[in-house]
Each structure stands twice: as structure tokens, then as C-alpha cells.
Amino acid sequence: MSEILIRNIKRLVQVREPGIDRVAGNAMAELPAIENAFLYLKDGLIHSFGTMDELPSLPTSEVLDATGRFVFPSFVDSHTHLVFAASREEEFVMKIKGATYAEIAGKGGGILNSARKLQQTSEDELVERTLARAHEIIQTGTGAVEIKSGYGLTTRDELKMLRVAKRIGKETPLTVKTTFLGAHAIPAGISHEDYVRQVIEEMIPAVAEDKLADFIDVFCEEGFFTADETERIVEEGKRFGMQPRIHANQLHRSGGVQVGVKTNALSVDHLENIGAEEIEALKNSRVIPTALPGAAFFLGLSFPPARQLIEAGLPLAIASDYNPGSAPSGNMPLMVAFACIKMKMTPEEAINAATLNTSAALAIQHSHGSITKGKIANVYITKPMSSIAYLPYAFGSSLVDRVILNGKIYS
């Protein structure tokens, strides 16, 4: 493996000692950094760092000068639907004209629209289309990503989606974690209870047999899956070795947060509709509350109450929800900007939420999410910037200049 020395870094950001796996509450406002720093990457890992005054003589195959630039750990995007067959901009226009999410779904749009398109698309075609999106998110600073199924809605097509996600992990330098989301919607031609039974009795064992999913997820929402159904499904997934994560409280007070706490989910995601009861439940758990500001922005929903979550001492995370219907962007710097502008998070809180806390939401906090000795060498170098706050402030600018993943310069 090659060695890379990055020198003259204006500010090396998110520098952590080993063992810090998440930051919560008031601690989210603290983002440790080193001024005028160097960072040495060796054998695909973070080897050492410090101030330029402390720079020893090091064997290097490549030296990068970062004068005037910041270096951050790569973003960890803990919630995406990166595998899909086609965009849905026709629904975007319907929304502009006043149609609601539920009305679009009722006319055969929404998730079922994506399912029809995906079922008609070959695995190789899906890989090709998803690869383009994977390289797009790498260029905006993402180094690790969760990818869900959920647009198959048949056993064959759910397995196809998860195989595609696994291939993205092999054919790109991204760290990929996979989630089985068969319980995303009820397909046409089958009763609600019969489909729940199919997910539990047929899909979960098939996914587990092929070792295709790290996690299991359910869209716990009115008109989709109840809290009781969500619990049944994720408990069966746990029996097959899949850790739960739950789509919770996006459109209504669905009970998803409480199910997530009860089933020891890694995360509960969305949270546009939560109150004191849900926050109190989260306070007594290790579940990571995850906001998806891109979806709230795109759908015109209320944003998750970030300040209340942080003031309750919780470790808030931020992910993109990249999908063709409600969040057609995997641009994590933009999500950080939305968190600051619309959720009133400070830049430091938002960066913590999109790196260390999302790594905890994927159970990869020991290898990703911070500048820590021994972690995987996933970092990006910015264009010249004046401060950390400039990243979300200049929300329309592309400020990621160079990306290094697994200790190799991405090009």
C-alpha cells in the first residue's frame, strides 16, 4: 500500500481519541481540530497526525499540500435508497401542483412506481445506474454508505436489489452496509396481512441464506406498516442476525420510535413528527435518532426538532435519505447546510451528526467517522476555506476538492 502525507493543513477536523463512538447533547457542539497540521496515511489507515512543528521524517509515496484548506473525515451516510431504476420527476411536478405524498401513492405513484420500474430492470442495468450515483456521492465527500432494498417488493427483486448493493461495495471504494427493507409498501395484488407474512416467512430467510443484509428496516407509518407489524418483522429479522433500524414518525406519530427503543434498534430515522413522549423514550436507550433533512425539505414537511433532541442529551445523526421520490440528493454537505439553516444546528453539531454519529448508526464507529489513529483512511480535502462554518454557509458551492478513500486518492 502507498503512503500519503498531507501537510500544511489549515485545520484538521474531527480529531478524536480511540474509544469515542458517538457524541451526544452539549458535547455535539465540540469539534476537536488541529491547526497547521499534517496527516499521515499508511496501508489504508490513519497512521499519525499532529502539528507541522511535530512532523517527523516519514517515508511517503505521495505528498499533498493543503495550505489554506481543511481536512475532514469522510461523511458516513447512514440512510439511503441508492439502488433504484429511474427518477420520478413527474411526481415532483405533481407535488408542485399541490398533490400530497399520500395522494401520489394512492394514484400508483410513490414507492409502487419505483417498484414497477425496478422489477423491469436487470441486475446489471441496476448496477450501472447505481454506480453512477455512488461515484456522485464520493465526489461530495461520502466514504461510507448504507443502502436499502425496498423497491423490489417481491422476494426475487428484493434479493436482486441487495445483490446490487453488495456489488457497489466491491466495485467502488465506498464502505457499504446493506439493509433489507421488504416492508416498505404493500404491493398490488396481495392483502396487507399476506404480505407481512411473506416478508416474515419467505423474504427474511431468503435474505439471510444469501447473507445479503446487515440490517432490517420497516416503514412504520399510517397506511404502510403498524407499530405491531414493525415489531413482528424486525424481531424476525433479529432472529436471522439482522439488526433493526426503523423509518419512524415521518408523516405521523406512528409509534415507530417506541418500537425502535423496544427492539433495541441501531437507529430510528426521519422523526419529523415527534414530541416529548418520543424524546423521553429515546433518552432511556442507545438508539441513535437520525434526521433526514433532505426529505423534509423536498416534501415541505416540518423538520425534526434538532434542538430539543440535543438539549435532551441525545446523539443526533444526519443522513441523506437519497431516493428518487422524496430526497433525490446524496450530497452530504447540503444535508449539513439544511441541518444548520432549517434545524438550527451549529456547524460543529451538524458535522458531528454526519460523521461520528452516523458511523455509530451503522455500527462502524470503530473504523469510520473521525480522524483517529487506526481508523480507515477516508478523508477529503476542501478547497481553500476561511472556517468550518463556511462549509454549510456556502451551501450551493462544491467545496470538496480531493477525496482519499482506503488510503488511495480517488479520481
PLM-predicted stretches and their roles:
Residues 23-28, 356, 376-411:
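C-terminal cap of metal-dependent C-N hydrolases
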Residues 61-62, 66-129:
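Metal-associated gating/positioning segment near the N- to mid-region
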Residues 9, 39, 44, 68, ...:
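Divalent metal-coordination and catalytic microenvironments
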Residues 239-244, 262-263, 300-384:
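His/Asp/Glu-enriched, well-ordered alpha-helical/loop segment
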Residues 114-129, 135, 143-255:
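Metal-coordinating catalytic core of metallo-dependent amide/deamination hydrolases
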Residues 1-57:
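N-terminal metal-binding scaffold of metallo-dependent hydrolase/deaminase domains
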